[in-house]
């Protein structure tokens, strides 16, 4: 089963296999249930505490027929993937430069580059090159971002 290039929103418990590129976007929480920890040690050389019994109570055991996020890909515009009470995530697939307006948004914004390279420039003129596998967080004071494309770029945009 190949899910290369698939976007999905898995709302509950999960595990991550080798070779996966995962953008784990989630609501704020101070809870982590560690089920298996690969025998890692804490700063004192002890194995870290596992939360096997607690995690069993938190797992949603229902099975989804299709957990992929279905959307119609579009070039050079925002396509919303997920909106929930905790965050909104959209995908941009750009071959042209774009200025994105955040003047009405009262949130930080995160870009996660999935393919290609671009230069992002905020309203104050601060610029940074963003490549596949890299992320950038813009503070809530950012009013606009100019994305200068170098051929093609695909990135996720997330805000609360």
Where do the protein language model's features map onto the residues?
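Active-site pocket scaffolds in enzymes
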Residues: 122, 137-140
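Single conserved hydrophobic/aromatic residue that forms the stacking wall/gate
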Residues: 1-5, 9-10
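Short, well-ordered loop/turn sites that connect or cap secondary structure elements
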Residues: 6-7, 16, 113, 130
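Conserved hydrophobic/aromatic beta-strand scaffold that supports enzyme active sites
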Residues: 22-24, 89-91, 110, 135-137
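Glycine- and acidic-residue-biased ligand/ion/polar-headgroup-sensing regions
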Residues: 96-123
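C-terminal amphipathic alpha-helical segment
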Residues: 33-105
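Ligand-binding loop in jelly-roll beta-barrel domains
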Residues: 11-31, 140-160
């Amino acid at each position: 089963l190949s899910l290369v290039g698939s976007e999905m929103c898995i709302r509950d418990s999960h595990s991550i296999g080798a070779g996966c590129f995962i953008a784990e976007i989630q609501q704020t929480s101070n809870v982590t249930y560690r089920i298996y920890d690969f025998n890692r040690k804490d700063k004192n050389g002890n194995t870290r505490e596992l939360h096997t019994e607690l995690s069993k109570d938190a797992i949603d055991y229902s099975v989804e027929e299709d957990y992929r996020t279905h959307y119609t890909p579009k070039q050079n515009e925002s396509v919303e993937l997920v909106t929930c009470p905790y965050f909104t995530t959209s995908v941009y697939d750009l071959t042209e430069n774009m200025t994105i307006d955040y003047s009405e948004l009262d949130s930080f914004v995160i870009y996660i580059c999935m393919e290609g390279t671009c230069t992002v420039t905020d309203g104050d003129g601060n610029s940074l090159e963003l490549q596949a596998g890299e992320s950038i967080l813009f503070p809530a004071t950012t009013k606009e971002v100019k994305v200068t494309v170098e051929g093609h770029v695909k990135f996720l945009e997330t805000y609360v």
